[in-house]
Design a protein with these regions (language model features):
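Alpha-helical protein-protein interaction scaffolds
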Residues: 1-132
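Hydrophobic alpha-helical membrane segments
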Residues: 26, 46-52, 56, 63, ...
Length: 233
């Protein structure tokens, strides 16, 4: 590659290296190599292959934002609608991984439109059912703020048992602290109940945020597993 005397020769050597990285399953490395391609020296056909490989390798490297960016660039750079159609499947899957259901469904519809006519109605019906059940992402930040009321953030995250435990634990500490104050045991109220309450309270807030993030990841993964299985049949 270092002996290449023209941009075209450099690109051919680089694309050969990309193929090696793909065969090795090193998708991130393949994306990095594609980033070195001198696109100004590519023909229309080569440019089509370049964007397709960038989108595909980015998706397989779990760089879904990168896959969608490659497809967006291809729409400006390519005039061949057939070439763009090759990327519709990647767009539907990558947008789904980002939780962009509207973009994902639009791309999936274009995938279905390219299928044989006798398959379209059934496939569209199954996809509509999947997209109708697309999960809504919950806000980790909102979960943190809701946890100012002990247990409420965990309930928002869908962790009922964790929320009940947090509510009971913090309630017990408050009850103990009030009892110690009434009994004029100021030191034990401050060091015991107060110290433990501050620990469980703030830990509970952070835990609610983490639980919400995990919930989002889980429902997103489950839904995209269904979508991928349907589109790759």
């Amino acid at each position: 590659m270092f002996a290449s005397t023209t941009p075209s020769e450099f690109n051919r050597a680089l694309m050969a290296k990309v193929e090696v990285r793909k065969q090795q399953g090193l998708w991130s490395d393949a994306v990095a190599e594609l980033g070195r391609v001198r696109t100004f020296a590519l023909s229309e056909d080569e440019l089509e292959g370049y964007y397709y490989q960038r989108a595909l390798c980015s998706y397989l490297a779990a760089d879904f934002e990168g896959a969608l960016a490659a497809i967006d660039e291809a729409r400006f750079a390519l005039y061949d609608t057939v070439a763009l159609a090759r990327m519709e499947l990647i767009e539907a899957l990558a947008a789904g991984e980002k939780g962009d259901w509207e973009r994902s469904q639009m791309a999936a519809r274009r995938v279905v439109a390219a299928m044989p006519a006798e398959q379209q109605a059934e496939m569209e019906q199954r996809l509509n059912e999947i997209y109708s059940k697309a999960p809504r992402m919950r806000s980790p930040e909102l979960a943190w703020w809701l946890s100012m009321v002990p247990g409420l953030g965990q309930l928002y995250a869908g962790e009922v048992w964790s929320g009940v435990v947090s509510l009971v634990a913090n309630g017990a500490l408050v009850t103990f602290g009030v009892g110690e104050i009434v009994a004029h045991h100021w030191l034990s109220a401050w060091l015991g109940a107060g110290g433990l309450l501050s620990t469980t309270y703030f830990v509970g807030q952070e835990r609610a945020r983490i639980l919400t993030e995990r919930r989002n990841q889980r429902v997103l993964r489950e839904h995209n597993d269904l979508l991928r299985a349907e589109l790759l049949k």
